[in-house]
């Protein structure tokens, strides 16, 4: 970290040179990212296995493949994203034009999380590069193999005058936060998000905070056994099959009517074994918990006797191998930690309700989540979920898939996050849209200049009310002020 300030100043100066604004530079850096992913795919999967115990197919599905898609999407849309957009002016603005011109913010900081160490590092970087910024990436120290690959190999594919990867723990993060940035993009916990936001206040630095929360899944009385089976499969893969539930958009808990709860639970028991095997610890289909601290946190969530009594499936833990079995609970106490804190692991509480409609009030009694998942064929209930709840995203009849949609913004609301990214939304979050107006010297709004009189006031009134007929009548002397 010696010479950090001088290195960062050099990157600021490089941005001021204007080189990163060129479309060819942006394309070359995006292609460099793509080459990194293609040529180090095996190393990426190996690092994800070492850090989190992810199966290589899961690693490809959730990180390698997602990033490949995102970069290709950015390369395809880049020139259009960079182009200015015309803005419509009132008709009275003769011989005038206006446009929105996107320009890079400047020098940005990206601080990523450990659960998807490549995806959550490079996805925002795609947007920052596409927008023409210089940047520093600080990957999470809790995924050391992945962070090492990013720090030691990624720079060989990119312009090191514009992109720098800095490894380290909280002390390094704190030192970086003391610097002046044009934007800070952070993915992680709400606790650290508050620290980021507090540090940003010093320089009035804008922030994007991708946080999390307790994402609910509402299961309605679906119309057929097929629909029920599809629902269960999608719930299980979204909860236990995505980094063992260590994902900000993973299902945190399920809401279901009492009369359907037993049907749901029994089918889940069967499908867990089919999907993850009789012994998931041996089949390598469920990722490991990232470290001992998080393992003990999950263990403590089950320590309460009332919570233990609500376990209907699973519950076993292997501290040596940081493995937690997929676990289902039915109606744990609502004031227990497992129902008040984000779980971030393979523990799935099911809360039973008298009516599925009660789920709306239940969800609204808690902070706005990053995502809500509703499995239902009832159009009226869908409309109510859409109009009466608030969340970063709302998905009907599936879960987590919204993360892969480049056409949709990804981000939270309230305590689940600030800002959005993915696709063009990533470009936008690292851009400033400059408002540009052009006027001719040939015409003017002469009635905007003193000295004042009632005639000018009439013209101003007509102008601000878009009353072009009234303006004509004033000019012709056919309309006077009352």
Residue ranges and their predicted role:
Residues 4, 23, 41, 225-229, ...:
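Residues at or immediately preceding the N-termini of alpha-helices
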Residues 13, 22-25, 324-482:
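Conserved C-terminal structural/oligomerization subdomain of aldehyde/semialdehyde dehydrogenase
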Residues 191-333, 396, 468-481:
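ALDH superfamily catalytic-core signature
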Residues 88-230, 353:
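Rossmann-like NAD(P) dinucleotide-binding subdomain of oxidoreductase/dehydrogenase enzymes
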Residues 111, 169, 187, 238, ...:
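Conserved residues at the C-terminal ends of beta-strands
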Residues 34-37, 41, 52, 75-82, ...:
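Structural signal for hydrophobic packing residues in well-ordered secondary-structure cores
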Residues 1-99, 472, 476, 481:
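N-terminal Rossmann-like NAD(P)+-binding subdomain of aldehyde/semialdehyde dehydrogenases
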Residues 26, 71, 132, 163, ...:
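Residue-level signal for inorganic ion chemistry
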């Amino acid at each position: 970290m010696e010479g950090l300030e001088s290195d960062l100043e050099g990157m600021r100066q490089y941005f001021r040179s204007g080189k990163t604004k060129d479309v060819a530079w942006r394309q070359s850096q995006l292609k460099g990212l793509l080459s990194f992913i293609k040529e180090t795919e095996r190393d990426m999967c190996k690092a994800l296995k070492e850090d989190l115990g992810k199966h290589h197919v899961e690693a490809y599905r959730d990180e390698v493949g997602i990033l490949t898609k995102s970069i290709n999407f950015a390369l395809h849309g880049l020139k259009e994203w960079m182009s200015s957009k015309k803005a419509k002016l009132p008709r009275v603005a003769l011989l005038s034009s206006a446009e929105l011109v996107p320009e890079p913010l400047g020098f940005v900081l990206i601080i990523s999380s450990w659960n998807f160490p490549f995806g959550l590092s490079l996805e925002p970087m795609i947007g920052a590069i596409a927008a023409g910024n210089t940047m520093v990436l600080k990957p999470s120290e809790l995924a050391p193999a992945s962070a090492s690959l990013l720090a030691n190999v990624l720079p060989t594919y990119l312009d090191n005058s514009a992109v720098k990867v800095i490894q380290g723990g909280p002390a390094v993060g704190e030192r970086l936060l003391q610097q002046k940035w044009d934007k800070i993009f952070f993915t992680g916990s709400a606790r650290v998000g508050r620290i980021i936001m507090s540090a940003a206040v010093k320089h009035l630095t804008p922030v994007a905070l991708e946080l999390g929360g307790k994402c609910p899944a509402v299961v309605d009385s679906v119309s057929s056994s097929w629909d029920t089976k599809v629902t269960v499969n999608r719930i299980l893969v979204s909860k236990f099959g995505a980094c063992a539930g260590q994902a900000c958009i993973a299902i945190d808990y399920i809401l279901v009517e009492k009369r359907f709860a037993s049907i749901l639970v029994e089918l889940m028991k069967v499908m867990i074994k089919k999907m993850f095997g009789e012994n998931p610890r041996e089949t390598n289909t469920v990722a490991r918990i990232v470290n001992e601290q998080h393992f003990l946190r999950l263990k403590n969530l089950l320590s309460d006797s009332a919570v233990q009594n609500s376990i209907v499936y699973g519950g076993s833990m292997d501290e040596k191998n940081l493995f937690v079995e997929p676990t289902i609970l039915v109606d744990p106490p609502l004031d227990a930690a497992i129902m008040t804190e984000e779980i971030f692991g393979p523990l799935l509480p099911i809360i039973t309700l008298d009516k599925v409609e009660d789920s709306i009030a239940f969800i609204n009694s808690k902070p706005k989540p990053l995502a809500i998942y509703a499995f239902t064929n009832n159009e009226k209930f869908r409309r109510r979920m859409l109009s009466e709840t608030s969340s970063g995203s709302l998905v009907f009849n599936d879960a987590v898939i919204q993360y892969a949609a480049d056409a949709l913004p990804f981000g939270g609301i309230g305590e689940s996050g600030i800002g959005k990214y993915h696709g063009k939304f990533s470009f936008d979050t690292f851009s400033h849209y400059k408002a540009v107006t052009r006027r001719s010297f040939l015409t003017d709004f002469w009635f905007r200049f003193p000295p004042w009189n009632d005639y000018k006031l009439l013209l101003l009134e007509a102008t601000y009310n878009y009353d072009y007929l009234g303006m004509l009548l004033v000019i012709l002397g056919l309309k006077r002020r009352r």
